[in-house]
């Protein structure tokens, strides 16, 4: 075959293949190869003689039917192979002799094609807007610019042969240039003013070629658009906003895999603020409680009403009756209705607070004896209702800050937090991860716990270790067999600890030993499984022991005085504040705690809590030690019986062999169960000992002494008033209080003495 004829058949087929690849999700390497093939294809395609100086192929028309080259020549009835090149003089003479023929339909189709893109970047005020996507509609783009460029200056999915100064643009694929990205566009975009839009004339609308070409982010969504989102310090950034199911998702760019912000609409209040003299844009304000979490700017009132309609539909409870046809969102009001309601609240609150004193205050103002005006009256631009709302927001933020500070201070004692690498937009980022209430929170830093970057509800999820040989300590969190998050630990112990904690928080019955581990050797696998088992058993025991979160003052009730002699020996706690025998040894008689039937269950914050904790942990420790000894004895008996069975199997290879083997298997299963129970007891015993040490560490500072278990023979030999051999730690403040005033240094109290002297001089 002729080489030219082969190229003539190959080029349109390659062009069609590239257009089909536009609709598929490709990896970065495959995408680079496809772009390289496209550039080579552009350089190899034959150019029409002296008619076109560059090549333009619109792949939007190539997704089905004949190729682009075939469509140009499908209506010619002549044989193209018989055509030959004519010399220039003959061509000019033919052109002068014959009039210009009428254009065929195919040539008219060629002339109707959109002109090629300019060889310069678009102006600074260029921006693109995605129309709202309703049910059964295809996504659409609106391209807007102030210049007088042709109407179809931007098409979806094209290949061009232009200068290197013009960056390649792909609207439907993964690759986008800097001026089409949402972060860069947010700085060049100025306003949503309707006056400017009216002066621009009709805007061209370009639809995506097919449903297959739509982005994966907007599939199965109720509505989507590129909207302006208000940042922290008042700037506006364009982001892809999507409503899926009952959540609002914000993406910084259409190529992102994870949303930058995820907001549950059923727990938010939405307020629509129309455009007026004070507000330059139509705004939707989303709030949780008294905190405003998101502000979105819309282009027109119709667009805002459409978004509000979708939010109302999403917020309705599923399967509700007519009486329950109220949206779950607490507030869904317009700004005018909100101001009206706030003004009514202001009038009622003013009438309630002033009461009958209005006439007196009016008379006082008329005579010039009224009080000074409040801050809101001096400002003049802020109503009392708005002031009260701001005060509530400030007080709420302070309360939240205090709670978060307390929580941050206690993070060292909680083993359910730490740094993990998180895969975000094809890149790893270090995040402070924290487990709380069956939810995994991601924070930018451990010092900033007030706001979280993302949160994952773990109930119903699964965990799967492994993410390739380059990341042996990575693991994935799956929900309905779809990846929700990909995390990576720093070492094998850290990975095992997180796996055990996540399995407990997910409510899974799978143990860390049952998981399938890849890309690790035997030693690393042993370390991961050991750490995972320890954390799994620790978290499971904590859940069994404390089914509900306990506050610091929540202690069990104290036993009555008539039940105290029934305490087990060796767990006696000396009560300096309640026993009558030790009252005489106290120097400060003012500190007393009376214990009787009416006040037996009343607790003070300090010493009584330490006493109760120490007594409870001592009892629990002894109970666990006894249980451990019992299990050890049973294990020894089972092992002895197992050895005897093995000897019997060796000596009697006959008909009883099968029965002996079954008995041996039963004994081995019992041994394994007892061994697991023993390991569980060991872990619980270690935890109880640590808590006992913590309670005893605060005991001596509060005047608490704990007697450990003493043998009866030693108590008979030693007198009762014997001083302990090792000195107990002493609290300096309590010792100074016990000293007599003569021992205290005389230079104390000079400041008060001087103050009294000055007062005497003044009088």
UniProtKB/Swiss-Prot annotation:
Modification sites for Phosphoserine: 98, 104, 153, 329, 343, 742
Residue stretches of biased makeup (Basic and acidic residues): 582-591, 754-763
Annotated PH domain residues: 220-316, 413-507
Record-given protein name: Actin filament-associated protein 1-like 1
Coiled coil residues, start to end: 606-694
Keyword annotations from UniProtKB, A to Z: Cell junction, Cell projection, Coiled coil, Cytoplasm, Cytoskeleton, Phosphoprotein, Repeat
Domain of life of the native organism: Eukaryota
PANTHER family: ACTIN FILAMENT-ASSOCIATED PROTEIN 1 FAMILY MEMBER (PTHR14338), ACTIN FILAMENT-ASSOCIATED PROTEIN 1-LIKE 1 (PTHR14338:SF1)
SUPFAM superfamilies for this protein: PH domain-like (SSF50729)
Composition bias, Polar residues: 175-185, 712-724
Summary of subunit composition and partner proteins: Interacts with CTTN.
Described function: May be involved in podosome and invadosome formation.
InterPro entries: AFAP, PH-like_dom_sf, PH_domain
Gene this protein is translated from: AFAP1L1
Cellular localisation: Cytoplasm; Cell projection, Podosome; Cell projection, Invadopodium; Cytoplasm, Cytoskeleton, Stress fiber
């Amino acid at each position: 075959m002729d080489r030219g004829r082969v190229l003539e058949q190959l080029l349109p087929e390659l062009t069609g293949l590239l257009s089909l690849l536009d609709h598929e999700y490709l990896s970065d390497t495959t995408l680079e190869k496809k772009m390289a093939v496209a550039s080579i294809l552009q350089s190899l395609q034959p150019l029409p003689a002296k008619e076109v100086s560059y090549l333009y192929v619109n792949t939007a028309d190539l997704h089905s039917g004949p190729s682009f080259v075939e469509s140009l020549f499908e209506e010619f009835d002549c044989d193209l192979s018989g055509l030959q090149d004519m010399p220039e003089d003959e061509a000019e003479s033919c052109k002068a002799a014959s009039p210009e023929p009428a254009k065929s339909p195919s040539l008219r189709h060629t002339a109707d094609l959109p002109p090629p893109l300019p060889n310069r970047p678009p102006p600074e005020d260029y921006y693109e807007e995605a129309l709202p996507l309703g049910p059964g509609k295809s996504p659409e783009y609106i391209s807007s610019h102030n210049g007088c460029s042709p109407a179809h200056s931007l098409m979806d999915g094209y290949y061009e042969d232009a200068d290197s100064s013009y960056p390649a643009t792909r609207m439907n694929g993964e690759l986008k240039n800097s001026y089409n990205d949402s972060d860069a566009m947010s700085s060049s975009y100025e306003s949503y003013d309707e006056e400017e839009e009216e002066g621009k004339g009709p805007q061209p609308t370009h639809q995506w070629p097919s449903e297959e070409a739509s982005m994966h982010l907007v599939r199965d969504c109720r509505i989507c658009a590129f909207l302006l989102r208000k940042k922290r310090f008042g700037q506006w950034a364009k982001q892809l906003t999507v409503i899926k199911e009952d959540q609002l998702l914000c993406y910084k760019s259409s190529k992102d895999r994870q949303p930058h912000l995820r907001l549950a609409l059923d727990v938010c209040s939405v307020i629509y603020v129309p455009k007026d003299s004070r507000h330059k844009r139509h705004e939707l304000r989303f709030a949780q409680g008294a905190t405003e979490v998101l502000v979105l700017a819309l282009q027109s009132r119709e667009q805002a009403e459409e978004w509000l309609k979708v939010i109302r539909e999403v917020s309705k409870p599923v399967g509700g009756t007519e009486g329950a046809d109220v949206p779950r969102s607490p507030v869904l009001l317009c700004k005018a209705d909100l101001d009206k309601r706030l003004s009514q609240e202001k009038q009622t609150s003013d009438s309630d607070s002033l009461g009958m004193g209005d006439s007196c205050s009016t008379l006082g103002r008329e005579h010039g004896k009224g009080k000074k005006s409040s801050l809101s009256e001096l400002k003049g631009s802020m109503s009392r209702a708005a002031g009260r709302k701001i005060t509530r927001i400030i007080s709420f933020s302070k309360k939240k800050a205090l709670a978060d500070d307390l929580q941050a201070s206690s993070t060292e004692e909680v083993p359910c937090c730490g740094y993990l690498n998180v895969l975000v937009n094809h890149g790893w980022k270090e995040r402070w991860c924290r487990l709380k209430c069956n939810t995994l929170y991601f924070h930018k830093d451990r010092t900033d716990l007030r706001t979280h970057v993302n949160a994952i509800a773990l109930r119903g999820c699964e965990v799967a270790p492994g993410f390739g040989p380059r990341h042996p300590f990575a693991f994935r969190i799956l929900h309905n067999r779809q990846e929700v998050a990909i995390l990576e630990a720093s070492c094998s112990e850290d990975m095992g600890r997180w796996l055990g904690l996540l399995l407990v928080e997910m409510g899974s019955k799978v143990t860390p030993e049952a998981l399938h581990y890849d890309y690790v050797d035997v030693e690393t696998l042993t370390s991961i499984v050991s750490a995972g088992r320890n954390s799994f058993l620790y978290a499971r025991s904590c859940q069994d022991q404390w089914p509900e979160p306990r506050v610091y003052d929540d202690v069990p009730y104290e036993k009555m005085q008539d039940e105290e002699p029934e305490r087990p020996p060796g767990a006696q706690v000396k009560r300096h504040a309640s026993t009558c025998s030790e009252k005489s040894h106290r120097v400060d008689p003012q500190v007393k705690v009376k214990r009787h039937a009416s006040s037996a269950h009343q607790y003070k914050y300090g010493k009584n809590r330490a006493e109760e904790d120490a007594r409870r942990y001592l009892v629990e420790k002894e109970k666990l030690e006894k249980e451990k000894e019992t299990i050890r004895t049973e294990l020894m008996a089972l092992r002895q019986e197992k050895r005897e069975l093995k000897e019997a199997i060796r000596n009697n290879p006959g008909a009883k062999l099968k029965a002996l083997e079954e008995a041996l298997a039963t004994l081995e299963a019992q041994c394994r169960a007892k061994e697991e129970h023993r390991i569980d007891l060991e872990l619980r015993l270690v935890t109880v000992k640590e808590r006992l040490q913590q309670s005893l560490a605060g005991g001596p500072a509060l005047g608490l002494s704990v007697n450990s278990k003493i043998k009866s023979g030693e108590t008979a030999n030693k007198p009762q008033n014997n001083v302990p051999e090792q000195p107990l730690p002493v609290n300096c403040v309590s010792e100074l209080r016990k000293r007599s005033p003569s021992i205290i240094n005389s230079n104390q109290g000079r400041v008060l003495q001087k103050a009294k002297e000055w007062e005497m001089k003044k009088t």
